[in-house]
């Protein structure tokens, strides 16, 4: 190390700058005295050159080290001093050093201070000076190429702005919520990092010289040519036009921020594009909805409304491949109200329905100031559609929801075929007189009887209403049957229900004393029976289930007798797959359903006929009808009629035991015995069931069953 004295004040400024830049300080006074003792003599300047050439800057020494290697430390420091003198300019010749502590030094003038040179700092300064030379050469190259740097003065001033920008500082005039970001990569990262001994102000003083490198200028050129100040919080969206919207004022930005987003209306299924290419614009123009050559004037932004808002951006010209449609025209106006009313068919209730072809009057009043230039349908299209509707009533073109909300149209849509037929029949019978309605043929049948027999429901309904108005609904033909009874016999359950609802009497009888229920029971019309019950409940009529015919039979008796006949035919027929057997099976099923329906309606099984006093169980036992016997005995009240006697004193067990040549006789007797029939009961001739059993193998089995039961009952209690 070498201690240099500053000789004169002429180079004092440069020396102070070097001293301030070095920031070298002595760490110990012992080292200072030690340093003075280790100074080489002034007569050896060549030794310094030799040592610098041999050692060089590769072996620097610490200024505060206590090493004993004096030659190494002194040689490195002397080299640093030589370099310092070469940078600072010509120095004055060294004066003879005064002898201090036995060592001679050159005299350099009055002592002004001590500077300790740091070799590491000198190395950094050397590297920076090399960069400054390279940057100066690059600037000269750019000047020779004709690059104008004046146009980038504004950017350079922004980049070289002194000091670190603080948080609250705003670089734009806009509000803080939409402040545009500066797209400069060198703004937050300075090109050089100052050392701890340097201040930020010194760094910014040297910054303009160090930023003039080739890479920095190239980055500035790229930033200026390619980028524009765009806010990171704002997305510019355009449906068709890719032109960048110019930067708006802070007031407009604030209004956009608080007022909500405003988009242009979708142009006829147009795809969503953001700054698309020209080729994409041509493809998207095919789907444009607005008319050709339509330019919307720029309007100020309004507050958000539920109505349709449009963008103030100009619409680009159409593509050559664009095909005009019905709604395109040179003039754009809203459709007149008269044409819309004709299109909707005078539907007053459909005004509240959202229709793409029409806007409500209230909406038009609200937006009349700024939507007068925007059209959704030209007047020519309205006229074309009105003319098309007038030309053809059965046109397929119709507006959606045009029939909604109209009570007449709702009734029209909900009308059934029967209602339409009734209207047709009423129009046909409008001119029929009263005498013609009441006229009869040779058999005493009226128009109503004939219509019911033919199954013409609509005509029967119209005639029945007209006959009921004349109080002639229950008029009868030559057999004493009314139109209602004819409908029951014809198995027209719908007509039966209509007639009962109109007012036909359900308990009327014919010439045989049969009520409509007797006819249903004999024929097995279970659906008609249900229709009578339903109609009677609706018309508040009482149905007499115990009414008897001239034979004294109730409807249930008639149904059992009819079923016995079918069972007898099935037992006698030996061809199970013949058509006759299939028909009998169907009739058998219908009769069983009719009997069940009668029981459900409330028919009494224990009811007796007027002539013989037989119950329904007696009638079922006469044919060994297992199906009906089982049906009756499964009722909760079976014990009240299982031992019921007829007028001759016979029970159902007497009847079943006395049968001959019946395949199901044994099963019928066993079933009756199991359900509580008494074999000891005697009739008027003092006969028990066992006395009536015929001879034969089947008779022996029946006697065994009856005796076994009777023996158990007659057994003595001991």
Curated annotation (Swiss-Prot):
Upregulation: By TNF, IL1/interleukin-1 and bacterial lipopolysaccharides (LPS).
Region (Disordered): 1-20, 58-108, 186-211
Main location: nucleus
Keywords attached to this entry: Activator, ANK repeat, Nucleus, Repeat, Repressor, Transcription, Transcription regulation
Tissues of expression: Expressed at high levels in peripheral blood leukocytes and lung, at moderate levels in liver, placenta, and at low levels in spleen, kidney, skeletal muscle and heart.
GO function terms (MF aspect): POU domain binding; RNA polymerase II cis-regulatory region sequence-specific DNA binding; transcription coregulator activity
Required for transcriptional activity as annotated region, ranges: 321-394
Subunit structure: Interacts with NFKB1/p50. Interacts with RELA. Interacts with AKIRIN2.
Designated name of the protein: NF-kappa-B inhibitor zeta
Lineage summary: Eukaryota, Metazoa, Chordata, Craniata, Vertebrata
Gene field: NFKBIZ
């Amino acid at each position: 190390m070498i201690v240099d004295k500053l000789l004169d004040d002429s180079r004092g400024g440069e020396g102070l700058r070097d001293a301030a830049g070095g920031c070298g300080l002595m760490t110990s006074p012992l080292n200072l005295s030690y340093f003075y003792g280790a100074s080489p003599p002034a007569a050896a300047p060549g030794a310094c050159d030799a040592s610098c050439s041999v050692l060089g800057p590769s072996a620097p020494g610490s200024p505060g080290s206590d090493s004993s290697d004096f030659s190494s430390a002194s040689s490195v420091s002397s080299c640093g001093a030589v370099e310092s003198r070469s940078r600072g300019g010509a120095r004055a010749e060294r004066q003879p050093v005064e002898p201090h502590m036995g060592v001679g030094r050159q005299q350099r003038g009055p002592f002004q201070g001590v500077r300790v040179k740091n070799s590491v700092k000198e190395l950094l300064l050397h590297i920076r000076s090399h960069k400054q030379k390279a940057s100066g050469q690059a600037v000269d190259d750019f000047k020779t190429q004709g690059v104008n740097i004046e146009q980038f003065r504004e950017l350079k001033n922004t980049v070289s702005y002194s000091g670190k920008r603080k948080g609250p500082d705003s670089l734009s005039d806009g509000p803080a919520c939409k402040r545009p970001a500066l797209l400069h990569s060198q703004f937050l990262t300075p090109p050089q990092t100052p050392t701890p001994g340097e201040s930020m102000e010194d760094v910014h003083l040297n910054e303009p010289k160090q930023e003039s490198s080739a890479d920095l200028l190239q980055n500035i050129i790229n930033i200026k040519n390619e980028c524009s100040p765009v806010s990171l919080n704002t997305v510019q969206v355009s449906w068709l036009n890719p032109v960048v919207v110019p930067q708006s004022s802070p007031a407009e930005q604030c209004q956009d921020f608080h007022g909500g987003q405003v988009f242009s209306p979708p142009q006829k299924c147009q795809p969503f594009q953001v700054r698309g290419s020209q080729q994409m614009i041509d493809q998207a123009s095919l789907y444009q909805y607005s008319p050709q050559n339509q330019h919307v004037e720029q309007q100020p932004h309004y507050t958000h409304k539920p109505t349709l808002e449009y963008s103030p951006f100009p619409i680009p010209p159409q593509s050559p491949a664009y095909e005009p449609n019905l709604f395109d025209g040179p003039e754009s106006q809203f459709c007149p109200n008269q044409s819309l009313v004709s299109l909707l068919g005078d539907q007053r209730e459909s005004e509240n329905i959202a229709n793409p072809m029409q806007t409500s009057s209230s909406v038009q009043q609200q937006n009349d100031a700024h939507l007068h230039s925007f059209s959704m349908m030209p007047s020519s299209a309205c006229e074309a559609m009105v003319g098309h509707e007038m030309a053809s009533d059965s046109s397929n073109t119709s507006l959606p929801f045009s029939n909604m909300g109209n009570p007449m149209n709702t009734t029209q849509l909900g009308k059934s075929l029967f209602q339409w037929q009734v209207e047709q029949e009423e129009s046909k019978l409008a001119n029929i007189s009263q005498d013609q309605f009441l006229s009869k043929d040779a058999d005493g049948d009226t128009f109503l009887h004939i219509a019911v027999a033919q199954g013409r429901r609509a005509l029967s309904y119209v005639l029945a209403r007209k006959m009921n108005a004349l109080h002639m609904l229950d008029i009868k033909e030559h057999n004493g049957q009314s139109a209602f009874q004819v409908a029951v016999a014809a198995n027209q359950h719908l007509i039966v229900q209509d007639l009962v609802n109109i007012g036909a009497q359900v308990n009327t009888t014919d010439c045989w004393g049969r009520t409509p229920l007797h006819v249903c029971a004999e024929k097995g019309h279970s659906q008609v029976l249900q229709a009578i019950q339903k109609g009677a409940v609706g018309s508040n009529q009482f149905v007499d289930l115990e009414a008897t015919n001239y034979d004294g039979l109730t409807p249930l008796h008639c149904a059992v007798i009819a079923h016995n006949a079918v069972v007898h035919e099935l037992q006698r027929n030996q061809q199970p797959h013949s058509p006759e057997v299939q028909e009998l099976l169907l009739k058998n099923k219908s009769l069983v359903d009719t009997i069940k329906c009668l029981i459900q309606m409330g028919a009494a099984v224990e009811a007796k006929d007027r002539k013989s006093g037989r119950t329904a169980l007696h009638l079922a036992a006469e044919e060994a009808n297992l199906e009906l016997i089982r049906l009756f005995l499964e009722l909760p009240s079976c014990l009240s009629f299982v031992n019921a006697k007829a007028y001759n004193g016979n029970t159902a067990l007497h009847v079943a035991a006395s049968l001959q040549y019946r395949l199901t006789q044994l099963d019928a007797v066993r079933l009756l015995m199991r359900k509580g029939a008494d074999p000891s009961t005697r009739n008027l001739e003092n006969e028990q069931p066992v006395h009536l059993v015929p001879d034969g193998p089947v008779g022996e089995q029946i006697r065994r069953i009856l005796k076994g039961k009777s023996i158990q009952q007659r057994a003595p209690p001991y």
